[in-house]
Amino acid sequence: MLDAFSRVVTNADAKAAYVGGADLQALKKFISEGNKRLDAVNSVVSNASCIVSDAVSGMICENPSLISPSGNCYTNRRMAACLRDGEIILRYVSYALLSGDSSVLEDRCLNGLKETYSSLGVPANSNARAVSIMKACAVAFINNTASQRKLSTPQGDCSGLASECASYFDKVTAAIS
């Protein structure tokens, strides 16, 4: 995983060049939006349990066969595993959002995830739907539009960070579909 600073230095070093120009401007922008980024991550992690439980509940409401005796969420153990997996995915999305880099998500969470779920017989469409619900919830919390919870956030537009967060969830959906 490379943060924004390490990425710039690594790229400049590979070119045997000084850090400057567009790279410095990108870092300046990253720093100036630092408080918003921290608040965005905080809004997601502060509501992680709510986001994950809403996603799993929504997935089950749309596909009640998941909790039937032959379903993938039947028994407390399987339901707990489903919630745990949602928490892990959300945690790695929050790491990516914090660092502004998806490599931690890709390397430590998504690598081999589809194959694991396939071998366990987990339906990809239900999984993708739960991730889609988590994405909508996280974006709502970042934009401070979640109906039940309003946080104090710095003034300004957070739509860029919400869009960045959404792109990380899109990577998860693509990896498991």
Curated annotation (Swiss-Prot):
Presence of the UniProt keyword Chloroplast in the record: yes
GO biological process: photosynthesis
UniProt xrefs under CDD domains: PE_beta-like
Location in or out of the cell: Plastid, Chloroplast thylakoid membrane
This protein's GO CC annotations: chloroplast thylakoid membrane; phycobilisome
Subunit organization: Heterotetramer of one alpha-1, one alpha-2, and two beta chains.
Extra information: The light-harvesting system in Cryptophytes contains phycobiliprotein complexes. Unusually they are composed of either phycoerythrin (CPE) or phycocyanin (CPC) but never allophycocyanin (APC), with only one type of biliprotein being present in any one species. Unlike cyanobacteria or red algae these proteins are not arranged into higher-order phycobilisome complexes, and they are found in the thylakoid lumen.
Name listed for the protein in its UniProt record: B-phycoerythrin beta chain
Organism: Guillardia theta
Lineage, broadest ranks: Eukaryota, Cryptophyceae, Pyrenomonadales, Geminigeraceae, Guillardia
